Every structure is written in C-alpha cells, then in structure tokens.
A protein has these predicted regions:
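Extracellular, repeat-based ectodomains that mediate carbohydrate processing or recognition
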Residues: 20-405
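Hydrophobic h-region of N-terminal signal peptides that target proteins for export
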Residues: 12-20
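Bacterial N-terminal signal peptides that target proteins for export
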Residues: 1-9
Length: 405
C-alpha cells in the first residue's frame, strides 16, 4: 500500500514538473469581458483573429465580437441581441470569417416554442461594414431541436453543419424524456451575399447532443461528428463533400463505445493543405482517453490512432485541435485529478512524437466552464475559456508563444 502511494506521488510530481509555469501564459488585455460573459469562440483566418461571446443582462442575451489587434482585444461590436435564446455550455454561438470576400458568419439559437427542446438556428451575416440578422439556417418549420453548428469559409462564402431534429417527435420527449425519431446531421452552404443554398442530409442517425466540427482541406469540406448506431455505439464518423454530394460516413476509429445516452463530447477537426487532424474523447470499456489521427490526403485515409498520454490525470474531453506548423498540432483537453479540474495542452507531430504536457490553468469541471478554445495566430497560441470557478463568471483569454510548447 505504501509502495503504491509512493508511485502515485512520484507520477503526480512528474506530471507537475512537465507542466508549464504560469509565466508561459500571458493574459490578453483590451476589451473587458463582463461578469456575465461566457461561451467564447475563436476563429483565425491566418491574417486576422476574432472572438465571439455572449452576455446576459435582465433576461436579454447579447452576442458580441471583437478583433485581436496589437496583442489585445479591440473593436467590440454587438452582432445581435434578443430574448428567448437557447444558450448552454455545449451548444453556443460561433463566428467565422471569409477573407476572400470580407464577410463574416455567426449564429445563435432562438426558441421556436415553449417546449424545452424546440429552437431554430438563426444566422447573422456581416458585409459592407455591418451585421445583418438573417433567417433560419435550416429549411424546415418543425418545432424541434436544431443546434451544434459548425462553419468554415468555403469559396467566397461558408459551409455549415448542424444537428437537426426535424424527424424527431419532441412532444414525446417532453413527456418521458426520450425522442422517438433519430437526430440528423445536415449541412448547407451560404453565399457571399448571405443566402443559404444546397441543403443536404449528411447522416440520418447521429448522437443527439455532441458538437459537429467542419473544415475545408484543399477545397474539400470535411465534417466529423459523433455517430450513433442502433445498438448505441457512439464513435466518431467523417464525411467529405465531393462533386456535389457528401460521401458515405465512415468511422474514424472503432472505439466501440457503447453508451445509452449522449456524452456531450464532440470531436474536433483542423486542416493545413492536404493534412487533416481529428481529435476526440472516448470512454469505451470504462477507460476515458483523448486520441487523435492524422491524414495526409485531405481526410480520405487516416494513420494510426495516437493516444494523448496523461498518466495520472483523468481526461474528460472537451477537446480542441490546431495546426501550428506543416506537420505539428496542439491539442487541448480537460482532465481531473482527485476531483479538481485542469486545462491541458500538448504538441504532437504527424509522426506521433509528443511534447510536454502543458497545464494552462486550474479550471472548474462544472458544465458552465464550457468548451475551451485554442487558435494559432502568428507566433502565438491564443486560449479562451469561461472561468466559472470564481465568484464572478467571466471569460479569460491568454496567449503563449508557440516556441515554448
């Protein structure tokens, strides 16, 4: 027993020694995030970095954005505001920027009835120097769930994917907590004028409330998401948009995670030229782990699964992934140790070599912490998350030099 405790203590010290110090991370100033701020979302076009977030005051929701200029947040701007929004820790507004046509896309979820599981995806479009409130991203009128949106620049507009509940019976879910029909994965394209076109069904049965993630690799849109089988296997699948159609979804890796309910823990994808990386969380056989795979051919095939070794800490997921060079990525995830949470990141190259585990911060494991964001901008890695462990819940943002990873 004593020997086991000594080993555990040694490994914990080893982890701590490999974690970076607070000096590696510098807080980002400029725009002050209000006490009620939460749900940050980062997007970088390479030349520009923007953030979106929400605030709530007196039953009114506000969706804001700001730019990263000269090492600080600047030009805070209101995208839209309103009441009866659906905003939660896992399904929150996003933002994207197409530098080819100088347009931006954002969204929020608007309640469509008094039913708990009834809301639409309302999107907002920025062009010619101002934001326009548009209509729904989807083309149905059902009073059901629509959410978990991801978007990415495509040609001179955007590609967007989301979870769509039009084929579910949510009156039944209101009564007994279970929907009678499957959740769909659907997509659409948005033109440089802000118009929606080409709605597609990507997968007719997917996990109900895990994030989708989309990228474009050499002009090919690629979406990853948590799939769902009839026997409740919920592994990660991928589909590519080729010649006007989405390919038949295939599994990224056969984790064979059987779980009778959504784990609310979606995958993440990023691309750099023909290289693609996908990271995800799984707890098959009761063993929680964060893994990733690389592709060298625009997501057509993937190499071996790479485990993000964590030795002591218990990974809980909420992953994000970002290319920082031609063949290197950074992965972030949440872990817990003896009930206390931390946000970690690690550099991995395409050959599977891993750098040190970097501890970003102690972080609450509550749902209100949300899904931390990382984004490369110039020579730095930008980090954003909701600090819900203090008396005042608000967004924190940091930067660290990529050379220190």
């Amino acid at each position: 027993m004593l020997y086991s405790l000594k080993i555990k203590l040694f490994l914990f010290i080893l982890i701590l020694s490999s974690c970076s110090s607070k000096n590696d991370f510098r807080s980002i100033g400029g725009v002050e995030f209000a006490e009620s701020s939460s749900e940050p979302f980062l997007y970088s076009s390479g030349d520009d970095l923007i953030i979106s977030w929400t605030e709530n005051k007196y039953d009114t929701n506000y969706l804001y954005t700001a730019e990263y200029l000269k090492d600080s947040w600047d030009n805070k701007e209101l995208i839209t505001d309103g009441q009866d929004w659906f905003v939660n820790w896992a399904d929150f507004p996003s933002i994207s920027y197409n530098k080819v046509s100088n347009v931006k896309l954002s969204h929020h979820l608007q309640k469509s009835s008094k039913s708990t599981f009834s809301y639409d995806i309302n999107y907002h479009f920025f062009k010619e120097g101002r934001w326009f409130d548009k209509n729904k991203l989807h083309n149905d009128e059902t009073k059901t769930e629509h959410g978990f949106v991801s978007s990415f620049p495509y040609k001179d507009g955007f590609v967007a994917t989301w979870l769509d509940g039009r084929n579910t019976n949510y009156d039944k879910k209101e009564m007994d907590g279970h929907a009678s029909g499957p959740m769909n994965l659907r997509s659409a394209f948005i033109s440089s004028k802000g118009d929606v076109y080409e709605n597609h069904l990507v997968d007719e049965m997917v996990c109900d409330c895990c994030q989708t993630s989309v990228t474009v690799s050499n002009g090919i849109p690629i979406v990853v998401y948590r799939d769902r089988s009839r026997d409740e296997k919920r592994d990660i699948s991928i589909s590519r948009y080729i010649e006007g159609n989405w390919t038949k979804p295939v599994s990224i890796h056969d984790d064979n995670w059987i779980i009778n309910g959504c784990p609310v823990n979606g995958p993440n994808i990023d691309s750099n030229g023909d290289k693609v990386v996908v990271s995800w969380f799984s707890a098959s056989n009761g063993v929680p782990k964060v893994s990733l795979k690389f592709s060298r051919d625009n997501g057509m095939t993937f190499g071996n699964k790479i485990m993000i070794d964590d030795i002591i800490n218990l990974p809980t997921g909420r992953v994000d992934t970002e290319f920082i060079s031609d063949d290197e990525v950074v992965v972030s995830w949440l872990s817990s140790f003896e009930g206390k949470g931390s946000l970690f990141l690690r550099k991995i190259n395409i050959n599977g070599n891993q750098g040190e585990i970097k501890k970003i911060d102690d972080i609450s494991m509550e749902r209100s912490t949300g899904f931390p964001q990382i984004e490369k901008f110039q020579d730095d890695l930008i980090i954003a998350y909701t600090d819900s462990g203090s008396e005042e819940k608000r967004i924190k943002t940091f930067k660290m030099s990529i050379s220190s990873l």
